[in-house]
Amino acid sequence: YLNLRRSQPTSYMALINTGKSFILSLSPELFFRRQGKIITTRPMKGTSCRGFSLDEDNKNRQELTKDTKIKAENLMIVDLLRNDLGRIAQKVCVPQLFQIDIYRTLYQMTSTIEGKLSKEDIKIKDIFTSLFPSGSVTGAPKIKTMDIIHSLEKEPRGIYTGAIGYISPENDACFNVAIRTIFLNGGKVELGIGGGIVDDSVEKYEYEEALLKAKFLTEKFWKYFSFTTIR
């Protein structure tokens, strides 16, 4: 876990020791954060690999920024989460749209949605009832998509695409979306990876994107290098 933290630092990491197994989460995605009456969610939709030269790296970032298919998918999730948040919050807004986050092995497109909880006594379970699972996992329409996933997948996902987080004594909370999350049980290691399929998805590219998301674990850490431009 410490090696992965150093090699692939992300914002919503977690380590859980159940006594019989371990969960190592290197999730870069915020499911929701509650701070007082403010609730924030930050869905992630859109992935591109880093380049092996400065020119290639900049090119990959620009292509992700301009990709109309990915932006349409991201906007679909934003609209879905605005609707989900609207059940428990007022003044729902989108302060950041199509932001590019930089990681050692890839770029990710994210957007931020915020709202003000409509009641003082809204509990964490009410938030989960409205938001879970994350719209970035299901796509839209949410219930129909979940029915399709259930009919296609023959085994439960376990922790994968669930949520890991904490609740403070003041009832503030922060939970990730359990992607890039490893389950260790005895000598067995599980890592769930996947992606969203839409009408104009290309099978080859979707498969390559799924493998890219697993590179933090499947390839040697020293293979990766990155460029940072300071302005």
Where do the language-model regions lie?
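Extended alpha-helical targeting/anchoring segments
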Residues: 1-231
